[in-house]
Amino acid sequence: MRSTGYLLTLSAAFQVAQAAVTANNSQLLTWWHNTGEINTQTPVADGNVRQSGLYSVKVQTTPASSSLYYDSFVYLAIPGNGMSDQLQYTQGYNQTQAWTSFLYSHDATVKISRNGSSANSNVVIRPTSLNFPVRYDNQSVYITVPYSPTGYRFSVEFDDDLISLAPSGARQPENALLIFASPFENSSTKPQPGSPNSIAPAPGRVLGLNTTSASTVVFNPGVYYFTGHDHMVLSSSVTWVYFAPGAYVKGAVEFLSTASEVKASGHGVLSGEQYVWYADPDEGYQKASGANNNGLRMWRGTLGNSSQTFVLNGVTVSAPPFNSMDWSGNSLDLITCRVDDYKQVGAFYGQTDGLEMYPGTILQDVFYHTDDDGLKMYYSNVTARNIVMWKESVAPVVEFGWTPRNTENVLFDNVDVIHQAYANAGNNPGIFGAVNNYLYAPDGLSSNHSTGNSNMTVRNITWSNFRAEGSSSALFRINPIQNLDNISIKNVSIESFEPLSINTTESWMPVWYDLNNGKQITVTDFSIEGFTVGNTTITASNAASVGRIDGVDPAYAGSVHYID
């Protein structure tokens, strides 16, 4: 339960003035915002940053040359971003999500205090596989974070802050705290200071980036905003946007360049907090009047007639108003992505997906908070690894449905699903999922099993080393709207299942048919290896009773193989 002092502190919006001590040396970089605003009720001022009134975080490298811990600003995202009329489009659990980020080159100790509360509550760090050393004193929790060249992204959860979400019974923090420890930036992700081809807008309202002749836009530390009726449309000359550590930009990015590479990098924040849900630029950034899929993306680009790579490194995105990313143009076969150390937080609105992974994409070392499709498997030759995912109440962790496709050679590996909270079958639950053809089932759900394409195949797919902590939905719910061949589910663990009564945990794969000729869709070589529920390994003999894999149609059951 929150302390009375905390409730009183948060009952009014006010600006915090604090003499913070931050680090800026070769071992550690932390940052602060002097315009932090503690406010959980309304939108914050344009030039302010919503700050946690509960958590205080300080960081020290180890071994330390002194006893000094350096302040690290704790950001906060809330459902609806303080816009009361937008709460109807959020997940409805009234949770908040705080986070802090720092750069480091040595092992570090993170000191966490709760304002108005003692530290006399055990914490769990998720993913639990990290096994970071934790110690306590009367006021704070101390977590040792070893240095890693790929960083760490994790959740710190106090036992006395956990709430039970109905009807799944999932135990989740009411006031989440995420820690993002990242390696220092290098010349490939940080522009040279004073480059003649760069422009650095002044903090405040940003204008004119659609007409600049610069190739690089640099957001230095400070607070920037585009308002809820504008976004960052970049001129065709701009190929790089850099968000410095300590930069906080309220807006969304749209590239018009058709260059061979466009890039967004840096360890600042891009926040969609000023936008309403499903903000449609063609309708004055108000909620779209229909399901036109034209909601504002946090990342958008336009292709020309040649190939392009979108490089995304280090940035934290908060409060996306809709799907996170889309490119458009002559052929999406021309776009690929390289994504590293990316974080998405505060995705409380519905339809807040993970990133698109276009052909050839490599995505790694990512934290996702999503309330729709997580890892979107729509294209070939894609690798995604080292993902931490906090799944809200809609759509599976991996989605590869909506329309028949030819997709091959995909590897998703080392994925920690630290939370799920599905309510019913209509949420499209599951670790691995493929919903129905959207042309005939707009919400992905339909009893029509004749919407497939027998001339298309998803093949040579490996989903390996997935770990679902806490209560989980089904291993898979797959509507095979095209043929499936050589699908490998390997080393997946589920700690426990959600209640059987809410119809989210049984795996199924019903028989499917071609839309035009009635031909049966085929499934060949579908293997499940090293799947565990709790401490039990799932085999053919206990797949239905323990693994809850009891909905595979007899037409496909002979192609599903279990390997201990």
From Swiss-Prot:
Organism annotation: Aspergillus niger
Primary location group: secreted
Gene3D superfamilies hit by this protein: Dextranase, N-terminal, Single-stranded right-handed beta-helix, Pectin lyase-like
EC number: 3.2.1.57
UniProt xrefs under InterPro entries: B_solenoid_dext, Dextranase_N-ter, Glyco_hydro_49_C, Glyco_hydro_49_N_dom, IPU_b_solenoid, Pectin_lyas_fold, Pectin_lyase_fold/virulence
Any single Gene Ontology cellular-component annotation: extracellular region
Post-translational modification: N-glycosylated.
Secretion signal, residue range per the UniProt entry: 1-19
Coiled coil: none
Domain of life, per lineage: Eukaryota
Keyword Glycoprotein in record: yes
Keywords carried by this UniProt record: Glycoprotein, Glycosidase, Hydrolase, Secreted, Signal
Example of a GO MF term: isopullulanase activity
Catalytic activity line of the entry: Hydrolysis of pullulan to isopanose (6-alpha-maltosylglucose)
Protein name: Isopullulanase
Purpose: Hydrolyzes pullulan, a linear polymer which is composed of maltotriose units with alpha-1,6 glucosidic linkages, to produce isopanose (Glca1-4Glca1-6Glc).
Annotated compartments: Secreted
Residues of this chain annotated as glycosylated in UniProt: 24, 94, 115, 138, 186, 210, 305, 381, 448, 455, 460, 486, 491, 503, 535
SUPFAM superfamilies the record matches: Dextranase, N-terminal domain, Pectin lyase-like
